[in-house]
């Protein structure tokens, strides 16, 4: 602050650790009253995050909120020039002085009211999209629901029993679909895609392709757009941890086997007496692997534990071994983990850098070899009838949609919100919101919970 505190237009210059904190906001208001200030410059983080915060401070201080300037010295200086502290500081000083000069030239403004279109576009007909559409319609907005596939429901529409409530996913989605199709304010378009967007926040015009070639189109005026396109599961490459061998299934394939059959477990006509689960397949991969996913998929530990409980219900005598790196059954889901142990599941912790090895035996069975960290790295061999690869979640690539809506995409392929805590569904494109698994790996319950936010933001 010493670099600018003596500038002729500066009356008060202060520094703070967290400018957005309540204590610092109070100091700003007090200085504005004591010094009879008429404008405000804040040099901190992104205006996308805190413009409204400090406009509110200006109002409470008796200033015109439009005679405030936010100077972004975090993203534009501190984070950008981590290897040049001196240069970053000099740049920050120049930016702050530019902000002061800009503020000196501002004039008081008064907000105006602009009519907006009371209709929302929801992209994606999975469980998050269905719930978002219903939530928006229930507060009186017209909704256009666009689904790329021929049917609604997404991945959850193919699920059987789900945790922790045990409800059937297909039945749950079927009820949601009936509610959506019966609602007078919701228009459902399947086999449809968003082709283009024009206009501005509150008054967008979107073009929807109604056939695969995009020849037949429809245009809708919408005030906001909610993206709920979901995610997909990781597909192992052939040979990865034995994938492609008889008796090696991914977790979704194993779950389908449980949902679609009854009686004693069998695989290819052979009884299943021993199951080995290998965790973190397609998640927490080494950064050097091309196309690898370094993130944790979060939901799959609990999903695997739940599947093991279902298998134990089918055959209480089945032996189940879980080869995990870290067990992340967070919150109340730890109760499922405890229950699975009580029912006989054995959990063996394996090292990050030495994954299990799956071998096909001449007898047709499988053998899984791994080092158990809980026994100081002792190598163990597990004869198994079935190996389940606990696969994670990956982003559903959609370059055309990203281009049409100008969606912000992270390095992991998921769509980015402005801030995970403060603005969890807003994107940098005003009026374009995201919810569900298109943001990050999450289970269906979390996807449904987050869908309530778009209605809050759309209605202000």
Language model: regions and residue ranges:
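Residues forming the flavin
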Residues: 1-460
